[in-house]
């Protein structure tokens, strides 16, 4: 649940890339004929060394935490059957048809299914709470969530690798073959919402190709997940009796249930509704595919004008983003607290 990493206003102005064997060979020849690159500058070398040091420190902290973990079995590099909801484990073992039958399409391009066992959700939350109290550095998920933690920094990298490889990718490959068929890395984190902290999250798209979102608990009211349309969706006015299909048109509101997952493309606009009471924790996995990100399909999405800016049906108010839509105030008044959040996000703070 975070802002898109590619600036739309810059993306749709970019020229369409054209690839050919001749062009590739010409580039290869130019590379061979060009002088060797100069040695890195002192500034570049210092930046690389600083990044390497931070990475080594993160690995060391993760190893330190794993050595005294509350539930050591959670750090296994293989998915354990007891981690999964029985129905999901059976679907994984039943082949493609069983997997497809297990996932319910609750809205166009949005799939819900039981995934994690209640015991796994409870133990993972307990482990992450223990890490928060351990005194070790906590890596926050992104610029839009002030609370939560990146799971790799807690030592869960191999666990999440296995979860992606054995559970997420087999289903994503069936539902989203272009975006999810060849995922090769991920960014996985936990987010939390409660009164006095983050209440919800503004409308956005994710910096992912496929997003998995699983509720871990606890008790709460409100805090739904609202879906609108896809980046680059048609802005044409709907026919009589049909719903508009633009990026900023309402599609579906999901009610979170412990252990139940939502799977969708990263470019599907969505936002976390404000929590009314209690506290909600969710496991988020952003899956990314290097091959898809080099494809014309991926690049073309950011050459399109932002939805609903060139005529067509007006946006639904619930689908407006005060941090991302520069025309927000043409439709809604911007409250002072939202103005402060928008200004902070644009400053990168």
Language-model features, listed with the residues they occupy:
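Fe(II)/2-oxoglutarate
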Residues: 1-108, 305-349
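Residues marking the start of alpha-helices
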Residues: 36, 111-112, 199, 271
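Short, functionally important structural connectors and interaction interfaces within domains
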Residues: 62, 66-67, 71, 76, ...
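Non-heme Fe(II)/2-oxoglutarate
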Residues: 71, 75, 79, 84-182
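Alpha-helical interaction segments
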Residues: 146, 183, 194, 312, ...
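Short, charged low-complexity intrinsically disordered segments located at boundaries
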Residues: 153-163, 197-203, 313-316
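Catalytic core of non-heme Fe(II) oxygenases with the double-stranded beta-helix
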Residues: 173-174, 179-308
């Amino acid at each position: 649940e975070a802002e898109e990493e590619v600036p739309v206003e810059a993306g749709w102005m970019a020229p369409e890339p054209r690839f050919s064997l001749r062009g590739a060979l010409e580039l290869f020849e130019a590379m061979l004929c060009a002088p060797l690159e100069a040695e890195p500058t002192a500034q570049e070398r210092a930046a690389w060394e600083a990044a390497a040091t931070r990475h080594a420190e993160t690995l060391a902290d993760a190893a330190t935490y794993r050595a005294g973990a509350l539930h050591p079995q959670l750090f296994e590099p293989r998915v354990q059957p007891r981690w999964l909801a029985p129905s999901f484990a059976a679907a994984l073992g039943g082949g493609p048809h069983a997997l497809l039958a297990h996932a319910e399409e609750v809205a166009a391009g949005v799939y819900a299914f039981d995934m994690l066992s209640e015991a796994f959700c409870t133990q993972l939350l307990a482990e992450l709470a223990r890490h928060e109290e351990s005194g070790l550095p906590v890596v926050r998920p992104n610029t839009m969530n002030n609370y939560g933690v990146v799971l790799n920094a807690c030592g869960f990298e191999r666990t999440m690798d296995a979860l992606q490889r054995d559970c997420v990718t087999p289903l994503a490959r069936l539902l989203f073959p272009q975006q999810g068929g060849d995922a090769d890395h991920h960014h996985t984190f936990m987010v939390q919402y409660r009164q006095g902290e983050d209440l919800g999250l503004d409308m956005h798209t994710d910096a992912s190709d496929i997003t998995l979102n699983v509720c871990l608990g606890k008790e709460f009211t409100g805090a739904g997940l609202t879906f609108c349309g896809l980046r680059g969706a048609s802005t044409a006015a709907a026919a009589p009796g049909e719903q508009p299909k633009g990026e900023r048109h309402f599609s579906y509101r999901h009610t979170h249930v412990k252990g139940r997952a939502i799977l969708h493309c990263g470019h599907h606009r969505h936002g976390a509704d404000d929590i009314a009471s209690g506290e909600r924790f969710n496991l988020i996995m952003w899956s990314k595919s290097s091959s898809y990100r080099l494809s014309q399909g991926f690049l073309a999405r950011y050459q399109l004008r932002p939805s609903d800016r060139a005529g067509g049906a007006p946006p639904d108010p619930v689908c407006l983003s005060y941090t991302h839509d520069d025309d927000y105030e043409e439709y809604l008044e911007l409250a002072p607290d939202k103005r402060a959040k928008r200004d902070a996000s644009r400053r990168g703070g």
